Structure formats: structure tokens, C-alpha cells
Regions:
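Intrinsically disordered, low-complexity terminal and linker regions
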Residues: 1-118, 219-234
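Segments that shape or occlude catalytic/ligand-binding pockets
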Residues: 11, 35, 96-234
């Protein structure tokens, strides 16, 4: 992440969120905001549009609702449901996945949650893997890597700030949907702070013993690509 993308102040945090909101609104308004939207898209360098395929939107809605984890039934995140779907393509990230990651196989459709203030930078560059000593990093039960969930509410709790992240003052949250090529994955039922073992492409941390929900972790960014960003509201 370059210096100009880093968030230093509360005002900068709010500015990042406001720009994401403007982007979302601009796409929805279509021709009425065509010029402004085009400028915003060019600035991002990312292809983003409202998902017009009704069948695919219905599939994604069912995917999100059907994967709510029962252990989150009494959490705030349980009440959040999808209201808008955006199709995204981050050119360099997608090319990296198509040429170097996809062929590893064992592809799973997964969720990634992040606070609204982080969504714009993710849309610009894709996910990044923070260094081990990075401050304010949630999780890391399975070492350094990109973390994904198979439960919408598990990932949604990160979007909501339930794990200690910054909560938005608005009542909406955003959830990414990605394809992750697990390749040769290492199965564990407990934490693995040392990370992905040598010779493996990823970790599949499975629920049932010490874990409530499955998590998928890969230390290789070419193994994943973000396909959609979904807005959810209670």
C-alpha cells in the first residue's frame, strides 16, 4: 500500500467511506451521473457495475442467507441482508489469478469481510497481506495470509467491526465474494499460528472441534480474485 493510500486521521477515514458511497450512488444513477461516475471509475482503475443478471443476483442472495452460521443467530450481524450487488474486476489482480492461481484447482467461492473504510483501497488494488508486525490486524490464528470464510456472518462480523475494527456510522456494511484456488490445502481443526506449511498452497481450518466456523487462508495472493462486492443492511 502506498503512502497516499494510508489512513492517518478520522477525517481521512470518513473521506474514504464517503468516496465509496458516492461511487455506489453514481453507478446506481446511471446516465444522470455518467460523467462523474466515469471519472471515479478511471481513478479506481477497477471495473465495477451493478449486477444486472437477476438469476445471478438471486443465487448470490441465497448464498449469503443460506450460509449464515447458527452460532451468530443472536449477533447483530444476523439481521443484515443483501440489498445491492456490484460486479467487480480488478485488472491486475484478475490477470494474476487467471495466469498463476486458477490452475492450482480446488476452487471455492468464499466471503471476505472488511470495514467500510477499507473497501475503497481494496477496490483499487485488491487484497494485500499485512506484514507480521502490522498494527490493528485482526485474526492471524493461521499465520500470514488472505483470510476467507464460508459463512457470510463470520465474514460479515469483520465488516461490522465486531472483532475490534472501526465501526461505520452508517447502517450498511459491505461483503466481498471471491473465488479462491485452494490447490493443495492443509487441513486443521485448531489454530496454526505458524501459517501454511511448506509444500501447501493454503489452509482449510475446519469447524467442529475448537473452531465454530470454517476459514480458508492462503499466503499467495495469486490464488484468489474478488468477483463481487455486496451491500447489506439490517
Amino acid at each position: 500500500i502506498s503512502t497516499e493510500n494510508m489512513i492517518y486521521t478520522a477525517q481521512k477515514l470518513q473521506d474514504e467511506y464517503d468516496l465509496l458511497t458516492q461511487l455506489s450512488t453514481g453507478v446506481q444513477m446511471g446516465s444522470a451521473m455518467a460523467g462523474n461516475t466515469k471519472q471515479q471509475m478511471n481513478a479506481l482503475g477497477t471495473d465495477i457495475e451493478i449486477l444486472k443478471d437477476r438469476a445471478e443476483a438471486d443465487r448470490l442472495r441465497d448464498f449469503i442467507i443460506s450460509t449464515k452460521a447458527s452460532n451468530h443467530r443472536h449477533d447483530e450481524v444476523w439481521n443484515y441482508n443483501p440489498v445491492r450487488f456490484f460486479k467487480i474486476r480488478i485488472p491486475k489482480e484478475r490477470e494474476r489469478y487467471e495466469t498463476r492461481g486458477k490452475q492450482k484447482g480446488n476452487i471455492k467461492e468464499c466471503f471476505h469481510g472488511s470495514s467500510s473504510s477499507n473497501c475503497l483501497s481494496i477496490l483499487k488494488t485488491g487484497l494485500v497481506i499485512p506484514p507480521v508486525n502490522a498494527p490493528h490486524v485482526c485474526g492471524r490464528m493461521f499465520g500470514t495470509g488472505a483470510y476467507y470464510g464460508l459463512s457470510s456472518t463470520k465474514s460479515g462480523r469483520y465488516s461490522l467491526g465486531s472483532w475490534g475494527g472501526k465501526r461505520s456510522k452508517y447502517d450498511n456494511i459491505f461483503l466481498f465474494i471471491a473465488d479462491v484456488a485452494l490447490g493443495k490445502y492443509y487441513t486443521t481443526y485448531d489454530s496454526l499460528p505458524s501459517g501454511t506449511p511448506r509444500g501447501y498452497d493454503s489452509i482449510w481450518a475446519k469447524a467442529g472441534q475448537s473452531l465454530y466456523n470454517d476459514e480458508l487462508i492462503t499466503p499467495y495472493l495469486e490464488n484468489q480474485t474478488l468477483k463481487y462486492i455486496v451491500e447489506l443492511r439490517p
